A protein has these predicted regions:
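Start-of-repeat signature of ankyrin repeats
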Residues: 4, 38, 71, 104, ...
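Leucine-rich solenoid repeat scaffolds
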Residues: 265, 270-300
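Ankyrin repeat boundary/linker residues
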Residues: 35, 68, 101, 139-140, ...
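Ankyrin-repeat inter-repeat connecting loop/turn
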Residues: 31, 64, 97, 135, ...
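Conserved ankyrin/ankyrin-like repeat signature
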Residues: 19, 52-53, 86, 120, ...
């Protein structure tokens, strides 16, 4: 029988271990060849979670660090698909934990990607960290760390795990736009993650590359509960300005969030402060209701 790369890959896709054995024994198939998606038999087996087949392929010379056309390795696939046993086996057999794909994402970041397997991803991330994964590594395009990604996706338990294992919760780590993990959580309105990050030492007054603070992000997105927590527990500067001279009150006023405007005014937000264009919160107000609130408190 004539064998080729597709015979082996199809056998792996079908979990047909007898056929895989037969093909490997023939010595006529390149075990590291790729299919039309540029994935090897080992990558496919790692996704599918068949440890017996993974072992068979590795024992017969499969390269554990070969990359797909976008730079993914078998370990990345196993991590992303929640295959803990295979992750362990590949690492024990020479898989490089800190290798990155073409987007600059490490195996650790790949392990965060399948939100349907959150419990399993926690175990995989902990295993990767225990075996030398760089917890503060960033991807190339956005410059986001695992902590930023988990904070933006609302995965509280992952955020806790990362911080407890040394992830940089302070403002030292920022993405390409200057955002911190706390900014991401505030923007998304995730109060529990915001609380945890603040309690863990996150800088509530950190600013991004345009001078936006955490409070401004929450005000722009309309997250009143987050705003209340930041002001009441975080010693946040209510009147901080961004690079255009806008304050949190201006952002809320412009966006039409009357309850946020009322609360910020109660907390002594400066109602007459002007931005770089000479505009006040009253000038920027989106509705008559907000204008009335501001006028009653002395806005001019």
């Amino acid at each position: 029988m004539r064998f080729n790369r597709y015979n082996l890959i199809e056998a792996v896709k079908n979990n047909d271990i007898n056929k895989i054995n037969s093909i490997l024994k023939s010595g006529k198939a390149d075990i590291n060849s790729k299919d039309k998606y540029c994935e090897t038999a080992l990558m496919i087996a790692s996704c599918k979670g068949n440890l017996e087949i993974v072992k068979l392929l590795v024992d017969n010379g499969a390269d554990v660090n070969i990359k797909s056309d976008i730079g993914n390795t078998a370990l990345m696939f196993a991590s992303e698909y929640g295959q803990l046993d295979i992750v362990k086996y590949l690492v024990e057999n020479g898989a490089d934990i800190n290798i990155k794909d073409d987007a600059g994402e490490s195996t650790l970041i790949h392990a965060l990607e399948d939100s349907t397997k959150k419990e399993k991803s926690l175990e995989i991330v902990q295993y990767l960290i225990d075996n030398g994964a760089d917890i503060n590594t960033t991807n190339n395009y956005y410059g986001k760390t695992a902590l930023m990604i988990s904070s933006s996706e609302g995965h509280l338990e992952m955020v806790k795990l990362l911080v407890e294992n040394g992830a940089d919760v302070k403002a030292k780590d920022k993405d390409k736009d200057g955002w911190t993990a706390l900014m991401w959580a505030s923007c998304k309105g995730d109060l529990e993650i915001v609380k945890f990050l603040v309690e863990s030492g996150a800088d509530v007054n950190a600013k991004d590359k345009e001078g936006w603070s955490v409070l401004m992000e929450a005000s722009y997105e309309g997250h009143l509960k987050v705003i209340k927590y930041l002001i009441e527990n975080g010693k946040v500067n209510v009147n901080a300005k961004d690079d255009d001279g806008w304050t949190a009150l201006m952002r809320a006023s412009w966006r039409g969030y009357s309850e946020i405007v009322k609360y910020l005014v109660e907390k002594r937000a400066d109602i007459n402060i002007k931005n770089n264009n000479g505009k006040t919160a009253l000038d920027l107000a989106d509705s008559e209701e907000i204008k009335e609130v501001l006028r009653k408190t002395g806005a001019k």
